[in-house]
Amino acid sequence: YIENNYSINSENVNIVSMRKGLMNGSYTYFNEAFKLIMNTSPNDADFSDLVHSKINIDNFFDYFIIQTYIQNGDWFAGRNNTKIWQAESSKWNYVLYDTDQSYSSNFDSINAISFARSPYKLSAEGDTIDYSSRNSKLFNHILNNNQLKCFFINRYTELINTIFHPSFFKEKLDSIKFKIEPIITDHFLRFPLDNFSYDDWIKNLDDYIQLNNE
C-alpha cells in the first residue's frame, strides 16, 4: 500500500499497529514522538508546532473524522484495526482499512467523538471498563489544544458539507452499488452476520443517509 501510493520503499518504513505492536522497521521513532507529545501540555505555546512536526495533522484529523462519522464498530475499542506508518525522519500517517462494520445502528446513541477520545467497554455486569489506548490518548490530548481543536471542528464541518453531505453521499452510493454487488455478496458469504445480505447492506446505508439528512 505504501509503496504503491507513496513510492516509498517498504524497507525504509516504520509501521506500528496499536494492537499488534511493531510490524515493520523500528518502534523507537513512534515511542519518542508519542512520549514527547504526551509529556507536553496542550496549553504550551509550542504544542501545535510540535504536533505538526511529528504527525501529518491533515491525515490525522481526516482519519478520525471518517472513523467517527461512519461509526466503525470494528475500531471503536480504541485499539483495533489501527495502523500508522512513517518513512524515516518524516511524519506519522494513519491507514484507513477494515471498515465493513460501519454505519451500525448500535452506535446511534453514542457520541462518536467522545467515545474515540475515551473508549470503554461494558463488563458482563454492566460496569464501565476503560479501554483507552495510545491511539485514543493521543487524540484526546491533541484535542485539548484550542488551536488544534478548532482546526478539527472546521475540517469536520467542511467534510460534512461536502463529501459527507447526504446528497453527495447518495449520488456516490448509487453510482457504485451495482458494480460492487458481487464483491459485497461474496464478503457476506465469507463472513456471515445473522444472514445479513447485500440488500440489507444497501438499505442500511440508505437509512443512515436519510438519518443524517434529517
Regions found by a protein language model. Name each.
Residues G21, S26-E214:
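Middle-to-C-terminal accessory/interaction subdomains
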Residues Y1-N24, T28:
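Conserved ATP-binding subdomain of kinase catalytic cores across diverse folds
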